[in-house]
């Protein structure tokens, strides 16, 4: 009898993880793109939210007390001034200097009903030498969740940063000085989610709106013979989903039915993504720590766009911003079209509250799909996450989905020289990287698959973070289009980001970060791109909120058809935190 109770308690705990927060589980049907690093498994490894198993019910009070003890509201507005020097250490390049004046705010909030983390910064640069002009820059990253009532949350996120405008162009890793191939991008998403226990059923629903905008600051300089491509403009994205499920108990298995709809409209070539699905899933516990998963459903997805307007020579016409002009007189053409049965099967293993593994294989998009996730927390200071994803995505949808996958609690960090937001963020509960999305502002829709790993840890006065991954994109363009030659082009990206920080004493600290990127370019005539960099910063508080910083960095870039670059940079600055 005792063994039966243990078995049922373990089975209920597994099922709670799969069925609790059912809105997230249904939404994950649209979240298997780059950057999430979790695919459909994201909800599987997440703690139960809004509804708990019998075991977690008994522990809920203890968790609530811990949350109250961890109540934190830390909002730090600041003013900053700095002097920057950059020098091209190869090829006899220029030495550039400029002064920065910045205002910003870093915030971490954790209360009973709200969680948020943000770093927002406005900066003006006064160019001084090397022909460098003045510039205004806005950058930031924010994630927040607000519980309006039990089970009903409003979530949102925003990103403002700079990235590579064209994956076939340079990747200096440092968007300062005379760098080319620079795009200013802005992305935001927001929406409500609802999780509710109705009798012995779990109900979930949600909606998300996303918007992404790109301004090309400095166009890419491409290798000889590489044709100039299109440039991303803006897109809007709507996602809605709902689900209803039941955990094992009355039945020897758990079940869930779900459905969703998504649409994205892009300004470029009147591009449109539209998808809908309905499916049923079952969870069959076979031991206190293992459950079998299975699902079957129907899905319809269409991606379409129009051709660019052609001049008398058959060359696409461009507007003043270098973007293709849409030929609205031509009919819409399909880039991708699927309509039919989808299925997947898998297993979930949860031997302890600190370890969980989910793996699935199935059929979607007319192809075999593999997804999964692994999470391991050996202690309260260390977390390792691994995600495998495969799905349809775009630059805009990838950014908003990647933002939604980031934690609401993280340490806001930036490049100490350029002030840009780091591509990877780390927190005590989870982390994430937007490196795949920021590698290339492609205008085409694509099939995205890959793997992402995150490690974050604290030991004594040290804190560490590592983000690494691989992302593969297969471009989807109408075969009958004048741009049809790039249909099926495969781009691959490998990335690594490492950061470490140490509090030296009560008044000073040291931070170090580095990155390594490799972009395997599949575009005709384009060459592969590799870049790497490392930076270090020392900060010391002199008086109350006044802090001085000294930083140095080294960035390297190499691509066939270009001179390799080695850029050294240094900064000295003062910040006053209010």
Q: Which ranges hold each PLM region?
A:
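Gram-negative and organellar
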Residues: 28-578
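Gram-negative bacterial Sec-dependent N-terminal signal peptides
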Residues: 1-27
């Amino acid at each position: 009898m005792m063994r039966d109770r243990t078995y049922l308690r373990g089975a209920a705990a597994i099922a709670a993880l799969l069925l609790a927060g059912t809105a997230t589980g249904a939404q994950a049907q649209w979240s298997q793109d780059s950057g999430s690093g979790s695919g459909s498994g994201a909800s599987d490894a997440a703690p139960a939210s809004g509804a708990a198993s019998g075991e977690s019910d008994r522990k809920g009070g203890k968790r609530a007390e811990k949350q109250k003890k961890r109540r934190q509201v830390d909002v730090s507005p600041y003013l900053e001034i700095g002097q920057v020097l950059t020098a091209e250490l190869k090829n006899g390049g220029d030495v550039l200097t400029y002064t920065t004046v910045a205002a910003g705010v870093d915030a971490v909030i954790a209360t009973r009903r709200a969680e948020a983390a943000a770093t927002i910064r406005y900066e003006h640069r006064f160019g001084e030498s090397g022909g460098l002009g003045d510039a205004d820059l806005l950058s930031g990253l924010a994630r927040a969740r607000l519980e309006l009532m039990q089970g009903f949350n409003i979530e949102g996120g925003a990103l403002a940063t700079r990235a590579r405008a064209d994956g076939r162009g340079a990747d200096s890793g440092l968007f300062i000085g005379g760098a080319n191939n620079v795009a200013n991008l802005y992305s935001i998403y927001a929406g409500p989610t609802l999780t509710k226990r109705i009798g012995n059923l779990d109900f979930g629903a949600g909606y998300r709106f996303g918007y992404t905008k790109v301004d090309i600051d400095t166009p890419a300089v491409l290798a000889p013979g590489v044709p100039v491509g299109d440039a991303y403009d803006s897109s809007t994205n709507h996602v809605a989903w709902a689900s209803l499920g039941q955990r094992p108990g009355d039945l020897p298995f758990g079940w869930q039915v779900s459905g969703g709809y998504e649409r994205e409209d892009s300004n470029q070539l009147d591009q449109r993504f539209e998808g809908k699905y309905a499916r049923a899933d079952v969870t069959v516990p076979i031991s206190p720590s293992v459950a079998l998963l299975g699902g079957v459903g129907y899905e319809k997805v269409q991606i379409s766009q129009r051709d660019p307007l052609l001049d008398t020579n058959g060359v696409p016409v461009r507007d003043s911003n270098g973007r293709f002009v849409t030929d609205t007189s031509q009919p819409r053409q399909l880039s991708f079209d699927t309509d039919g049965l989808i299925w997947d099967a898998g297993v979930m293993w949860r031997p302890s509250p600190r370890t969980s593994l989910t793996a699935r294989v199935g059929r979607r998009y007319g192809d075999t799909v593999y997804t999964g996730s692994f999470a391991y927390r050996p202690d309260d200071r260390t977390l390792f996450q691994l995600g495998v994803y495969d799905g349809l995505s775009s630059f805009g949808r990838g950014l908003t989905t990647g933002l939604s996958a980031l934690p609401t609690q993280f340490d806001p960090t930036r490049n100490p020289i350029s002030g840009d937001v780091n591509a990877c963020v780390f927190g005590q509960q989870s982390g994430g990287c937007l490196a795949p999305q920021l590698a290339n502002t492609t205008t085409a829709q694509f099939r995205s698959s890959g793997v992402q790993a995150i490690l974050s840890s604290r030991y004594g006065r040290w804190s560490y973070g590592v983000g690494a991954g691989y992302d593969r994109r297969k471009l989807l363009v109408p075969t009958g289009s004048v741009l049809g030659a790039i249909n099926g082009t495969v781009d691959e990206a490998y990335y690594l980001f490492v950061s470490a920080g140490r509090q030296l004493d009560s008044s000073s600290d040291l931070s170090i970060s580095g990155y390594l990127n490799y972009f395997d370019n599949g575009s005709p005539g384009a060459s592969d791109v590799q870049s790497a960099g490392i930076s270090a910063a020392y900060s010391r508080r002199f008086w109350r909120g006044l802090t001085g910083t000294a930083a140095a960095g080294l960035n390297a870039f190499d691509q066939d058809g270009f001179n390799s670059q080695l850029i050294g940079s240094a900064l000295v600055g003062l910040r006053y935190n209010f």
